[in-house]
Amino acid sequence: MKRLLLSIVLSGLVSQAAFASADLAKAKNCMSCHAVGNKLIGPSYKDVAAKYAGDAGAEDRLTQKVLKGGSGAWGPVPMPANTQVSEAEARTLVKWVLSQK
């Protein structure tokens, strides 16, 4: 019974973290150009996760791309710098993006 209760509590915490990160992406206007499962202006989060799967340095590089912007990795439209996003928020967002399957 304790294991069942622990599983329920932990799954709730994981779900809350996932929803919190999706809410953060919406609040920081990431969803204006990106979506979880389909390409908009920028790549889908699932495509980003697939491209960087197994890349140990991806989290750090993508955190900097969120903060400073970038170009060339996904086509001709550059990603602008996101001055409204703190480094901690960028890291949270990147971890969430990389967790998409």
Question: What are these model-derived regions, one by one?
Answer:
Residues 14-20:
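Sec/Tat signal peptide C-region and signal peptidase I cleavage site
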Residues 26, 35-65:
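Gly/Gly-Pro-rich "capping" loops immediately C-terminal to redox-active cysteine motifs
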Residues 4-13:
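Sec-dependent N-terminal signal peptides
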Residues 22-24:
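Immediate flanking context of iron-sulfur cluster ligation sites
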Residues 29-36, 93:
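The canonical Cys-X-X-Cys-His
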Residues 41-50, 65-94:
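Axial heme c-ligation environment in periplasmic c-type cytochrome domains
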